Amino acid sequence: MANKNVGTITQVLGAVVDVRFDGQLPAILSALHLEHQGKKLVLEVAQHLGESTVRTIAMDSTDGLTRGTEVVDTGAAIQMPVGPETLGRIINVIGEPIDERGPIGNKTTLPIHADAPEFVDQSTETEILVTGIKVIDLLAPYCKGGKIGLCGGAGVGKTVLIMELINNIAKAHGGYSVFAGVGERTREGNDLYHEMIESGVIKLDGPGSKVALVYGQMNEPPGARARVALSGLTVAEYFRDVEGQDVLFFVDNIFRFTQAGSEVSALLGRIPSAVGYQPTLATDMGALQERITSTKKGSITSVQAIYVPADDLTDPAPATSFAHLDATTVLNRQIAELGIYPAVDPLDSTSRVLDPRVVGNDHYQTARDVQRILQTYKSLQDIIAILGMDELSEEDKLVVSRARKIQRFLSQPFHVAEIFTGSPGKLVAIDDTIKGFKAIVAGEYDHLPEAAFYMVGGIDEVIEKAKKMAAEAA
């Protein structure tokens, strides 16, 4: 123990632990280790209090922790196992496996705190990432190496959409993915793991797994939830920087990262800012988001679920996230109530790459025409509610009819929801999506019933469904 820097615990306040060091004080963000109930407990230094005491945040429960316990300074930040050995495994915030399948066997570890790539190392190419989901590919397309946000209140389908994207992109993409479960339901994390095993994305009996899972779920203390996104990102950065891969990085949910940060901030006694959030909200978010970027070696495309408290998009937590995103997919409760899934709002969702120079004129024009029709329908809804459809002009009636068909055609059965809905999932090629919407806008399918457009894949299925409906009616 002679060369180790050892301190003793002087105070335990929930997740906050004060430690006194007689020798040198550990640096801020250093990891401290101690034995607690037969397990390793990690504390991260957050503040220096006076000459000999540090205030730390615990990464696990502090129940049963007593004053006087010895703590060892590691002299470095929390270290995360990285490399191909992490694929197919579930790891917690401090890099320990939690899937009961033995040690990870990694050869390399990296600290979870790192600088963002230098300005000169970043890549600026723009290319569309096809998801196979009609509403996204047409109206708010994702960009390779970009940041994508899925925003919505509770229970509108963020996690289902993220799981469908993992299913569609991770399988078609062939590269590696990293999933960071930040403060979400343990049940969903468990479901995701077993679904990945069933679909072959994770292989239990040998190499070939394509995804690493890093979990810090709702039941974890705030310290773990505030750091698990960084732990997951460290695994993804290794694949980008060392192996030159194009990595997919999924975060569910980025709001919980902010929420945990606000809990930690309050425990540390900082004065809160707007709506009770931490004063360092923008700094914390920037430190995470700036590391998620594409370099000349490889790229990280990140898909982040963003919980919107009380469906208020102006809340500081989602509003701070938006500043960093290339595309936002907004999920709307009113659309979910109509039974249209994915409940993506076609007018609120935005994308930086919906630009004729990136997607081409045909795609751009079709998307804008679809939005124009939907916007006109939205502005006519008050008149329809008060006076009824009969008071509209013939031209407006036609717009409403097409808008309702477009609205239904934006729905789509998902592979991951097959077990609930019983209808097989559909993956639609982007050319088919553009062709279908272009034809609806042009009025080529004005004669088909609205119901034929609901929960189908491409436009050919609409025609089939309409024939079937006509045959049944006859």
UniProtKB/Swiss-Prot annotation:
Q: Catalysed reaction(s)?
A: ATP + H2O + 4 H(+)(in) = ADP + phosphate + 5 H(+)(out)
Q: List the keywords (alphabetical).
A: ATP synthesis, ATP-binding, Cell inner membrane, Cell membrane, CF(1), Hydrogen ion transport, Ion transport, Membrane, Nucleotide-binding, Translocase, Transport
Q: Name one Pfam family in it.
A: ATP-synt_ab
Q: What class of enzyme is it?
A: translocase
Q: Does the keyword Cytoplasm apply?
A: no
Residues annotated as binding ATP are G152, G153, A154, G155, V156, G157, K158, T159
- GO MF annotations, alphabetized: ATP binding; ATP hydrolysis activity; proton-transporting ATP synthase activity, rotational mechanism
| Enzyme Commission number, as recorded | 7.1.2.2
Q: How does it sit in the membrane?
A: Peripheral membrane protein
- The coiled-coil regions, if any, are none
The UniProt entry lists the main location of this chain as membrane
Which cellular component, as a GO term, is one annotated location?
proton-transporting ATP synthase complex
For the keyword Metal-binding, the answer is: no
Compartments where located? Cell inner membrane
Q: Which CDD domains match?
A: ATP-synt_F1_beta_C (cd18110), ATP-synt_F1_beta_N (cd18115), F1-ATPase_beta_CD (cd01133)
How does this chain assemble? F-type ATPases have 2 components, CF(1) - the catalytic core - and CF(0) - the membrane proton channel. CF(1) has five subunits: alpha(3), beta(3), gamma(1), delta(1), epsilon(1). CF(0) has three main subunits: a(1), b(2) and c(9-12). The alpha and beta chains form an alternating ring which encloses part of the gamma chain. CF(1) is attached to CF(0) by a central stalk formed by the gamma and epsilon chains, while a peripheral stalk is formed by the delta and b chains.
Free-text function comment from the UniProt entry: Produces ATP from ADP in the presence of a proton gradient across the membrane. The catalytic sites are hosted primarily by the beta subunits.
- Family as reported in the entry's similarity comment: Belongs to the ATPase alpha/beta chains family.
Query: What protein name does the entry list?
Result: ATP synthase subunit beta
The record lists the organism as Paramagnetospirillum magneticum (strain ATCC 700264 / AMB-1) (Magnetospirillum magneticum)
Give the classification, highest ranks: Bacteria, Pseudomonadati, Pseudomonadota, Alphaproteobacteria, Rhodospirillales
Identify the gene encoding this protein: atpD
